[in-house]
């Protein structure tokens, strides 16, 4: 394996990943001539590497766009665009802002080494964070070029990690001895492997087969629908979804004739929810209005139960809708999903424990499910990929025991110097979340404001997690959906921008906030570049 050290890298900033977050980071750090390492041969991230024939965006186009780049076509179309349209949009964004010249495709980052001042820290230091561009390299980055095995080393002052929480590392369930996939005589694969299949390969895999899909989140729902559609007509077999935990889903963004944003995405609606750093009086206020929040949740649940046959199939969650929204667990149910269930092409089996046997799956109640193909839609472990390239002791400090990375403003890890993270915080619009954090990070790198001490940054993160923990049992993720506007306000205040982005009070109070609200005016642009 060849290896060489590239001391001629002209950039001071490296960006790892060219998905949505990587593109947003590159565009906002363009004046630093960043080097963007992307393992694949094009931009798009998970939208290119892991999509199915039926995959669509979970929102309308206007709710998934960059602040300074509206959708060029069909922007006002309220339907959810398929993944090919999203890829085209992301590619157009990269070309419009001339970002491709910064890209190094076919370049997989396999290791980063700390080469900052002195020895690698062995103890937690809660003092000042330090300069993000100190004038000399802080990290060495090892990059594998294509399939050649050649390794190049580059040195940078600042590294932005944009591989995201999904990454390309599948989360595989653990099984007791002699009860794992090796016992099964059929085909076992993760959803990540399925989405790499060509259309004809996928159809051949599913058609006429007894398919079991493990999971009940977005990927699992898409896969079950895809299996049902591949088995239409004579000889078609039903797909069975193995469900451990049910979550609320909605058919569209209207509830009893009212737009969904009225309930969670306006200042008025989020005012009813707890937020970090709130006063005692505000805590008391939120406690008093907890009944109103419960009424809102029940109101939405009543519509979902009327519109979708969750009770018919035993899929009604035993927790509130608000819990799923507060932990970013809500999904949009495809319009023909339950149509296929009513036709008998999608079936459901609830079980918290299961394992393999020769013919299929055994459940904890002793029943069995025969299968030809088992697809594990059990999620991804993007942080495992991150841990593989980050050295100690930073690897140990990377996440808390809960599994959540302690990121200040969702971007800076207080214990890891000169490294930013974009795409690891969730909200109702992950593109908007990533873009705003990229804007904030750019101003931070440009020294437009200073970070507080590491201790204060960790304290702020803990307060955010406390809000999520008090709102939902599914708190092991950094989700800001119920206080996203206040989170954006804090970032605007850091950047010296007016956090109130609407033209009048009524819009400020009752209209939704999105990426277009954070498009910089001419005066703001001049202030930012001054």
UniProtKB/Swiss-Prot annotation:
A GO molecular-function annotation: peptidyl-proline dioxygenase activity
Pfam families: FMO-like
Binding residues annotated for FAD, in chain numbering: 17-21, 38, 46-47, 58-59
Name listed for the protein in its UniProt record: Probable flavin-containing monooxygenase 1
Gene from which this protein is expressed: FMO1
UniProt source species: Arabidopsis thaliana (Mouse-ear cress)
Keyword Phosphoprotein recorded: no
Induction, as annotated: Locally and systemically up-regulated by the bacterial pathogen P.syringae.
Record's function text: Required for the establishment of systemic acquired resistance (SAR). Not involved in local defense mechanisms. Confers a salicylic acid-dependent (SA) resistance to virulent pathogens such as P.syringae pv tomato and H.parasitica.
Keywords, in A-Z order: FAD, Flavoprotein, Monooxygenase, NADP, Oxidoreductase, Plant defense
Keyword flag Transcription: no
Family statement: Belongs to the FMO family.
One GO-annotated biological process of the protein: defense response to fungus
Binding residue positions for NADP(+): 219-222
């Amino acid at each position: 394996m060849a290896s060489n050290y590239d001391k001629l890298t002209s950039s001071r900033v490296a960006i790892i990943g060219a998905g949505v977050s990587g593109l947003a980071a590159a565009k906002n750090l363009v004046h630093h001539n960043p080097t963007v390492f992307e393992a694949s041969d094009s931009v798009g991230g998970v939208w290119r590497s892991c999509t199915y024939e039926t995959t669509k965006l979970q929102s309308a186009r206007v709710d998934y766009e960059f602040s300074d780049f509206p959708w060029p076509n069909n922007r006002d179309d309220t339907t959810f665009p398929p993944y090919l349209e999203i890829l085209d949009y992301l590619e157009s964004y990269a070309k419009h802002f001339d970002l491709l010249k910064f890209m190094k495709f076919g370049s997989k980052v396999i290791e980063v080494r700390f080469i900052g001042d002195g020895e690698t820290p062995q103890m937690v230091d809660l003092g000042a964070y330090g300069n993000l561009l100190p004038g000399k390299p802080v990290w060495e980055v090892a990059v594998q070029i294509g399939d050649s095995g050649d390794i190049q080393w580059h040195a940078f002052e600042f590294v932005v990690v944009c591989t995201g929480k999904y990454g390309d590392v599948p989360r595989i369930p653990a099984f007791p001895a002699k009860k794992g996939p090796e016992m099964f005589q059929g085909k076992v694969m993760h959803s990540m492997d399925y989405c790499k299949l060509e259309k004809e390969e996928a159809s051949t895999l599913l058609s006429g087969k007894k398919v079991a899909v493990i999971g009940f989140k977005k990927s699992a729902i898409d896969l079950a629908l895809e299996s049902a559609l591949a088995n239409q007509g004579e000889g078609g077999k039903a797909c069975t979804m193995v469900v451990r935990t049910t979550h609320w889903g909605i058919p569209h963004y209207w509830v009893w004739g009212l737009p969904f944003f009225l309930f969670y995405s306006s200042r008025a609606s989020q005012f009813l929810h707890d937020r970090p750093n709130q006063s005692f009086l505000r805590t008391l206020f939120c406690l008093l209005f907890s009944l109103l929040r419960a009424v809102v949740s029940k109101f939405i649940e009543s519509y979902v139960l009327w519109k979708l046959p969750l009770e018919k199939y035993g899929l009604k969650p035993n927790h509130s809708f608000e819990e799923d929204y507060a932990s970013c667990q809500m999904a949009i149910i495809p319009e023909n999903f339950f149509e296929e269930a009513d036709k008998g092409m999608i079936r459901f089996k609830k079980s918290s424990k299961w394992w393999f046997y020769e013919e299929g799956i055994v459940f904890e109640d002793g029943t069995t499910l025969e299968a030809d193909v088992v697809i594990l839609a059990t999620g991804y472990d993007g942080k495992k990929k991150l841990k593989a390239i980050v050295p100690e002791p930073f690897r140990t400090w990377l996440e808390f025991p809960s599994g959540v990375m302690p990121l200040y403003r969702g971007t800076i890890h207080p214990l890891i110097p000169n490294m930013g993270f974009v795409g690891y915080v969730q909200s109702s619009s992950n593109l908007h979340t990533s873009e705003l954090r990229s804007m904030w990070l750019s101003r931070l790198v440009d020294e437009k404001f200073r970070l507080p001490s590491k201790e204060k940054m960790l304290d702020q993160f803990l307060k955010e997690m406390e809000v999520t923990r008090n709102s939902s049992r599914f708190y092991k993720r950094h989700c800001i959906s119920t206080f996203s506007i206040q989170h954006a306000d804090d970032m605007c205040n850091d950047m010296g921008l007016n956090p109130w982005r609407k033209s009048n009070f009524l819009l400020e109070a009752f209209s939704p906030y999105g990426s277009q609200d954070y498009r910089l005016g001419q005066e703001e642009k001049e202030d930012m570049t001054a």
